[in-house]
Amino acid sequence: MEESEQVLPLLTNPKDLTNPSYASSSSSSSEPRDETEDLLLPISDENEEEEEENSPIRQVALTVPTTDDPSLPVLTFRMWVLGTLSCILLSFLNQFFWYRTEPLTISAISAQIAVVPLGRLMAAKITDRVFFQGSKWQFTLNPGPFNVKEHVLITIFANAGAGSVYAIHVVTVVKAFYMKNITFFVSFIVIVTTQVLGFGWAGIFRKYLVEPAAMWWPANLVQVSLFRALHEKEERTKGGLTRTQFFVIAFVCSFAYYVFPGYLFQIMTSLSWVCWFFPSSVMAQQIGSGLHGLGVGAIGLDWSTISSYLGSPLASPWFATANVGVGFVLVIYVLVPICYWLDVYKAKTFPIFSSSLFSSQGSKYNITSIIDSNFHLDLPAYERQGPLYLCTFFAISYGVGFAALSATIMHVALFHGREIWEQSKESFKEKKLDVHARLMQRYKQVPEWWFWCILVTNVGATIFACEYYNDQLQLPWWGVLLACTVAIIFTLPIGIITAITNQAPGLNIITEYIIGYIYPGYPVANMCFKVYGYISMQQAITFLQDFKLGHYMKIPPRTMFMAQIVGTLISCFVYLTTAWWLMETIPNICDSVTNSVWTCPSDKVFYDASVIWGLIGPRRIFGDLGLYKSVNWFFLVGAIAPILVWLASRMFPRQEWIKLINMPVLISATSSMPPATAVNYTTWVLAGFLSGFVVFRYRPNLWQRYNYVLSGALDAGLAFMGVLLYMCLGLENVSLDWWGNELDGCPLASCPTAPGIIVEGCPLYT
């Protein structure tokens, strides 16, 4: 059995599969373009004579087209216009909603759908006149019908604006939480360098994470399915629906339905029925609360509850979903209850689930009192106030992060070490390619030196900024080089896990741990080290995922590279400008005491982490001076767990299910908590089971036609209705005050149960 087959559950003989054909609606009328010819390379006769092999991954074989039309124009006027507008609009809206108590993320799928009628309108109305005809500068604003390759590049622009720019956390925490100074220029340098640094790592690891068929990036299949539904002409089967018809129906239903959980009946976000039966029991509400407790029996009837933190369960392969589910059960339903009811780390003094920082008496820790005028830890003030405490779940979540780190390294070494070594050797000689890689050979690749130039220039600019503006950033030059070292070590193993399972173990904890031990008492330095070590790696994985999308849709790599660079730079500027405007114009933004809708929940978690790892330092919390030193044993647990699975797979080679146990995914299952909550997981796993196991196994034809299309329709309907509700009602603060909008209905879930601890609204235990 090949190495890739040891971890992939759904491999099959390619000859048993149907190969979906590619038929763009515009391919028949488009003429070859000079821009495309410049990106083409001849395909050897030897490759043309090879037997066509589809992808060994069944989901890819059923979803991705195996043909290409290189004559389709790509870098068109409408691509630049619609791509730039999509990037700007999504960047603004996502950052605008990011600071709100209930943040709304507008995915690239929204733009992916919205630009279709606009692109076709531009194709119908804009002149097709050829300017400077006969010269090397000739161009036209309208090269023909709106085609799928233009559409893919527009979506790449939209992807740049579809998520948050992580380095914005640094700016927000410094300005809104610590109330210190950081200039716009310095903020822009930090944001751009962290985003662009990922291109360097992406270039280094392309041959390992894009070209191999085993690195299939499940999330991309949602977009591939949507592109095909929007562009291919499909015959309607008797009694059935085309994918386009199905998408429209599902989109309308999702759009109309979200008015209930999004506005009229918000309790649908988390139906914690255990709390309804025990309205006066703290223990019952701790167990049953989907938002503030363990979420036993809790379920959400809201697509945003399902997909907001873990992504679409319809895009996750079942074995990965099962690993997440098992990891969630072990942590939330086994480890946390045992530690809480045994009062480990004074657990009963604090809520069972919280990201807040506490004093020994259960009150919120006064952070500002332990910071001196130089933005460093005031040690005498810290000793007067006493040590910082975490709720037991928060402490365990850090331990789980430690275990996930060592498990990732060990898992990749054991299950993919030979594969990585063989790939390294194959990069210097001819290798057998699948159909998608062979089709991409006709296009000129991005030269390695492009990536190296970006990497070296970016690292140099980062070192200069950190040294010249050290009073604002606090990070010394050696910290930048150390962060880059951490990123380059972990990009490949975490990239492999993500490319196979659609789940990414987090690296943020180890970056915080390293710099916190080496350079304690400097919170901004800790945050900067984290974004250069962690986010540059995350950006690399995002760029690699986009490269794989281009690989599936046969986009010229140099064109894809250009779109990624331009989209990233535009999104950085728009994100920062929007965040700066909000922080300058909204009084007390991120202040939860004011009952404002602008409470910045994710930035609060980032701020708490900067206090734990940067200001106070891991030595005083997890080291020899701390209360939680035993949490470090999780490193050993994480290293041992993959070895046990590997040994079991060798001892029982016929037990295929053993090879599907992915310890990095299983151990890091709860890494999104907080801000994710239990109900996000329970509902996500249920939806993933129905899609990835039940439908895929018993109705494979139905799954093939509609699964990924349904995922895109649910995302899009939610996003459009979410924006509409906010623009029409949210801006005017029009709300409904009734029991159906009381989220969760578990007011006692956050109460402590230790004797003598007084918290407003909670019963006093004696």
From Swiss-Prot:
GO terms for cellular component: membrane. GO terms for molecular function: oligopeptide transmembrane transporter activity. Residues 1-58 are annotated as: Disordered. The chain crosses the membrane at residues 79-99, 104-124, 154-174, 184-204, 247-267, 287-307, 324-344, 390-410, 446-466, 477-497, 509-529, 561-581, 627-647, 676-696, 709-729. InterPro entries: Oligpept_transpt, OPT. Residues 45-54 have a biased composition (Acidic residues). It is found in: Membrane. GO terms for biological process: protein transport. Expressed in the major and the first-order veins and in the hydathodes of the leaves. In the roots, expressed in circular zones surrounding lateral root primordia and in some part of the root epidermis. Expressed also in the sepals and the cortical tissues of the stem, but not in the conducting bundles, the petals or the reproductive tissues. It comes from the Eukaryota. Keywords: Membrane, Peptide transport, Protein transport, Transmembrane, Transmembrane helix, Transport. It is a multi-pass membrane protein. Involved in the translocation of tetra- and pentapeptides across the cellular membrane in an energy-dependent manner. May also transport cadmium complexes. Belongs to the oligopeptide OPT transporter (TC 2.A.67.1) family. This is Oligopeptide transporter 7. It comes from Arabidopsis thaliana (Mouse-ear cress).
